[in-house]
């Protein structure tokens, strides 16, 4: 998938499915990108060729900046708010329910909803540049 909402790419080799996401705004995750990641995880979970899912993001900066700030600012009513917050819930549930091991590769800052992705992983490999922050705790 490639759109103005970012990209999700998948490659399967020797039983390992490598899933990589990218968004130009520090790998933030707008709704369509979250939905695509959840769909891909569910699909790989039922693929008999796949034994392990390796999840990561592109770039050398942030692993994941969390939710799309523009989408958060655009919430005008309860229905829109519910849809916004269900995006991460849907992805995290897909990861938790996936019968394959999910190994997440973290290479930089991980903020907000990105922390949920890390927590939903079976294993996490982090570089020395990785850091985790829940911005909600700064309030």
Outline where the language-model segments fall.
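CoA-thioester-processing core
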Residues: 91, 95, 105, 111-139
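Short, histidine-centered active-site or binding-site loop motifs used for metal coordination
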Residues: 21-25, 73-76, 106
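Conserved CoA-thioester-binding segment of acyl-CoA-metabolizing enzymes
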Residues: 1-56, 93
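Hydrophobic/aromatic residues within transmembrane alpha-helices
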Residues: 19, 55, 68, 117-119
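Glycine- (often His-adjacent) and acidic-residue-rich active-site loop
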Residues: 57-91, 110
